[in-house]
């Protein structure tokens, strides 16, 4: 075709050199052609002849006999019809020819193949139809560009698709058979049979293309019934799986099914179906049965947790993360189990609740277990992490002894003599302990106990190292702030200052020639308020020599610091006694004596402890055995009595020493009922408890391979109930002041506040130390109103104002 462009034919009367368009498509030699400005109407017969030519060509294309056709001529003829306003005739004719071919030939072939190579026949017909429509579209390209656009109808190719869809694919039994065939093949493959995947893929692609610009045909004719059938299939399979398998096996089978369906969709279904079919599998195999799966007896979440099934838990977490509320369901089950385990550990009847170290170690082991699950099974999920923290906070605070026991555990780790542990290992344990500390709601109670235990470590020189102690205080400071640790840091300062004072005192003794009666005294001067000293002066009748040595120090100290007061605190001191044992006791002899010792004392700002020694020897004894006995100040006071008396009853000892009953019982238990290598005294009768009628004497048969023998004080595994009540009363008293201080701080800043908001802010301010109850806060508010720090507003009694 030699026109420069189609518009050249509309440029008026102009002579152009070209080929003429023959009426019946025959090619003639070149002749001049005159095109006039007004096109004449074509003769009807001429139009019919052109259409007959085009119709014949279309039919030949459909029969695959297109090799002898001149597509250039056919294009010109179609162009001529459209140009002369016969586009509708051409469009309608095309529709009729294509419809007739599909109805009479293609559909009949497909119907005959319903039970024999159906998909192959349909696919062949579909491919042939697509090929023919591409050729027809090329011939009728001008009609697509002009008539189709002007009249807003389907283009040639899409028209062919629509006719194929309606006359073949969606024709009655063909549509049903296609659906059932595809669904049947998928079902067979699910059962493990081998099917022609390419045939299914071709059919699905055909349905997608027949939707033209949407997926409606594919969705209605295949996907929707496919998803419905799949839901029914997996609904039945889930029941079978649950009945026959454990939770872990069930999870693995579900994972396999999801992978199968995903792979199936990628290989021969439309890619958009993948997410939909996977969602169906997740719904039927997971979501509907979530609770059943996690609660499976002997295989569910609890079983996995009990038996460290880390990998199985990870599989369950991964699987349940696919469905809404899946992770919450697993999390709730884990939480319930964790709370049960925690409650069992902290309840009074559990054996560990009488042993602080075992109590805390069990909690740390439980935390380690669930941290392991968190990392390796639950992908460090922040919700699971928060759940574990919340659960630990819940059951740790069920037991009011937790603050005390946590402090005792730290005390155990920071004492000298921890076997088989490096400083790095101790550091790791203390870091874990700090995690438990964060869960404590009564941190002020912990502070009180920690102060007591730290005092004993410092005063008795039991700390594994100053660095470890200061490192622990640094951890507490980071967690709670400097106010929490200021007193603890003050205790360390006192020890440093005391060392300097003792150096000065020793120089004073040398220069003044003071007589300390052989007592090598060491005093710790403690600042009231920093140390857990008793408010009332403890009762204890000190032996003469230690008392005289202490009095010498008192005079020296008060001469340098006039206006201060020193009070002995014997419960915090210790002593080294030089002891001599003269052999096994004879009926007629009184053997055994305690020779002059060195002693150490601890003095507080109003408190001090000291030990002293007196020498005396008995006769009629065997070869003497000398030992240095390391004891507490109370134990020293008891032992020194036996330098003057062979036998003493409990009541006599109490009368002579004036030691508080509770402390005296512990001292005697350590001396007479400890390990065989530490029994300095003998008790009669040999009962399990110290009683007022018991009689005591020196164990002349005492022997030890060690020259220096340390008498282990019967350490309280925790406070006794009376002690605990006393501590609780002190804590409650301190809390009153802290609550009132918080109320005043808030009201001073805000001037006016409603009751509920004030309670909330006070609770939030004090949360780092303890959780005050609204009732207690209300009482403290009323107390401040009585003392005229606050006032109620006249218009609303639930609103308070600050009184400057």
Q: What are the residue ranges of the model-derived segments?
A:
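Eukaryotic scaffold/interaction segments
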Residues: 2-804
